[in-house]
């Protein structure tokens, strides 16, 4: 039985643990970027899709709030209050009126600054793990409400699956479609790209008349998902930030060309990049495309993934 932390900070009784939470990476099947808003964000119309590349966060009892980390790019991340994991834990504690005491350990597989929402995923994992550890008993929607203040992608990664994102991306509604498994190849580049820098570059390209026509509505993408045909879906994948990512990292054009030459149905830059994702017709084709990309000097690594998968979950 789990008992919540008491607001007076006394030692709780009956809290079990550790709690391990797996959280997926995110790709955008459609990323329509509108004009810059007065608050400094862009209005988005995006379709999020959770894929089977996961980080894992373990939460244990502690007498302070501490974070350790291993895996993909772990040495490049701060472990203090600037880290989204720590910020998420503190936000949940403040919301629930409990002291933020936990020992958190993060195993990373999602590349840093790769357009896969790795930091947002870890924040979602922290909310779910600490909710379990502290017995705060919040619903998914309540956790997503806290998540919205941490980052635009964080609410989606609480839920997972496939979802429509509007506003700055934080307003999430699930996409209702018959269950389908989509097969992806994820080509990870060396280094990362800053999301704010990518948005500023898109604004610059648009001001100069050098950007593609904005994608706008995601209706065609949502209709393609309902058809459950990868070839139809391939024809409507799109990302307004791709122009910016290619301008900032021209080598990504060779990655996209190589993936499609290897047999992918379509390839796009994931989010703000520099990761590229390719849709394959089936699992065997995905393995073959990943193998061919791995043999070329166009990405740091290529791995297969499937989607959609669940969001942050204990287990």
Swiss-Prot record:
Pathway: Isoprenoid biosynthesis; isopentenyl diphosphate biosynthesis via DXP pathway; isopentenyl diphosphate from 1-deoxy-D-xylulose 5-phosphate: step 3/6. The lineage of its organism: Bacteria, Bacillati, Actinomycetota, Actinomycetes, Micromonosporales. It comes from the Bacteria. It catalyses: 4-CDP-2-C-methyl-D-erythritol + ATP = 4-CDP-2-C-methyl-D-erythritol 2-phosphate + ADP + H(+). It is an enzyme of class 2 (transferase). Catalyzes the phosphorylation of the position 2 hydroxy group of 4-diphosphocytidyl-2C-methyl-D-erythritol. It comes from Salinispora arenicola (strain CNS-205). This is 4-diphosphocytidyl-2-C-methyl-D-erythritol kinase. One of its GO terms (biological process) is terpenoid biosynthetic process. ATP binds at residues 111-121. SUPFAM superfamilies: GHMP Kinase, C-terminal domain (SSF55060), Ribosomal protein S5 domain 2-like (SSF54211).
């Amino acid at each position: 039985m789990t008992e919540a932390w008491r607001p007076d900070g006394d030692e709780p009784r009956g809290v079990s643990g550790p709690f391990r939470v797996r959280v997926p990476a995110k790709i955008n099947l459609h990323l329509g970027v509108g004009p810059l808003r007065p608050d400094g964000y862009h209005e988005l119309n995006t379709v999020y899709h959770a894929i089977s590349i996961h980080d894992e966060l373990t939460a244990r009892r502690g007498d302070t709030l501490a974070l350790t980390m291993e895996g993909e790019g772990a040495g490049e991340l701060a472990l203090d209050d600037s880290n989204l994991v720590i910020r998420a834990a503190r936000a949940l504690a403040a919301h629930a009126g409990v002291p933020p005491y936990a020992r958190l350990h993060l195993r990373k597989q999602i590349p840093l600054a790769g357009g896969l929402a790795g930091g947002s995923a870890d924040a979602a994992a922290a909310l779910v793990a600490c909710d379990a550890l502290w017995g705060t008993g919040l619903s998914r929607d309540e956790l997503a409400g806290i998540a919205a203040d941490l980052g635009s992608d964080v609410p989606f990664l609480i839920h997972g699956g496939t979802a429509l994102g509007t506003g700055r991306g934080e307003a999430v509604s699930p996409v209702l479609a018959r269950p389908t498994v989509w097969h992806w190849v994820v080509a990870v580049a060396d280094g990362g790209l800053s999301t704010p820098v990518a948005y500023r570059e898109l604004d610059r390209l648009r001001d100069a008349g050098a950007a593609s026509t904005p994608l706008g509505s995601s209706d065609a993408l949502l209709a393609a998902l309902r058809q459950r045909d990868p070839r139809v879906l391939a024809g409507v994948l799109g990302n307004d930030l791709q122009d910016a990512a290619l301008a900032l990292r021209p080598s990504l054009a060779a990655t996209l060309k190589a993936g499609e030459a290897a047999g992918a149905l379509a390839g796009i830059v994931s989010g703000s990049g520099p990761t590229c994702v390719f849709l394959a017709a089936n699992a065997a084709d995905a393995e073959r495309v990943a193998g061919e990309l791995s043999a070329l000097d166009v990405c740091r690594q290529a791995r297969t993934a499937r989607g959609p998968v669940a969001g942050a979950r204990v287990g």
